[in-house]
Design a protein with these regions (language model features):
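DNA/chromatin major-groove-contacting recognition/catalytic segments
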Residues: 83-84, 180, 184-200
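Flexible interdomain linker/hinge and immediately adjacent N-terminus
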Residues: 1-28, 73-76, 113
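C-terminal catalytic core of Y-nucleophile DNA break-rejoin enzymes
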Residues: 75-95, 104-126
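N-terminal DNA-binding recognition helix of tyrosine site-specific recombinases/integrases
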Residues: 1-11, 50-53, 118, 127
Length: 200
């Protein structure tokens, strides 16, 4: 019984949402990006908290620059959510990337087609290796697209955003899901608190 409880606690501690990148890591990844498109992919995954399939589904028509909003589509026939663009530098970059296009996928491959999910994985892993940044999760070596979603959620939480705001931002159907994932303290926060209190 004790062993089972210990294993359950270990799994809980190793939840992916407890591990995230810091803003300084995001900047390093942006700098290490091979081209402007990849830089915008990093920023979009982070500043919009998108899942990778939401990223590849993103269309020029989904962007409302005037109101700084993005219409995020999960898939055909599925519900959409409205996400605010909260970083002005990112808004400027996205405008530049889209240029004069009125419609079509925002992120294109070298063949001028929408990026595949596999391509997004490769781009993130490659940039992570180039920047020398590994996945903070002990069970995963390379960066993956979802780490940016965890990272922006933790960043917003640290800035005092409510769990309800983060729930709507990420598109969680359940408030409980948001609280289970981000209502707890992160590994970095645990370490920082330990250093602060034990060093007193």
């Amino acid at each position: 019984m004790i062993k089972i409880k210990c294993e359950a606690m270990l799994k809980q501690q190793m939840r992916a949402s407890a591990y995230h990148l810091k803003p300084a890591d995001i900047k390093k990844l942006v700098i290490a990006s091979s081209n402007f498109r990849d830089r915008c992919i990093i920023k979009t995954l982070y500043w919009l908290g998108l899942r990778r399939h939401e990223l590849v589904n993103l269309d020029v028509r989904d962007i409302d620059f005037e109101r700084k909003r993005v219409n995020v589509r999960r898939g055909k026939g599925e519900k959409t959510r409205i996400v605010p663009m909260v970083d002005d530098e990112y808004v400027g970059d996205l405008k530049h990337l889209i240029g004069g296009h009125a419609e079509g996928p925002i992120f294109l491959s070298n063949q001028n087609k929408a990026l595949s999910l596999r391509a997004v994985n490769y781009i993130i892993e490659y940039i992570g290796q180039k920047a020398g940044i590994e996945n903070p999760h002990p069970g995963r070596k390379h960066l993956n697209p979802h780490i940016f979603r965890h990272s922006i959620a933790r960043f917003l939480k640290s800035k005092g955003f409510s769990a309800e705001w983060i729930q709507n931002f990420l598109g969680h159907q359940s408030y409980k899901t948001t609280m289970d994932m981000y209502g707890t303290i992160s590994i970095d926060e645990m370490q920082e608190e330990a250093v602060r209190k034990l060093g007193e």
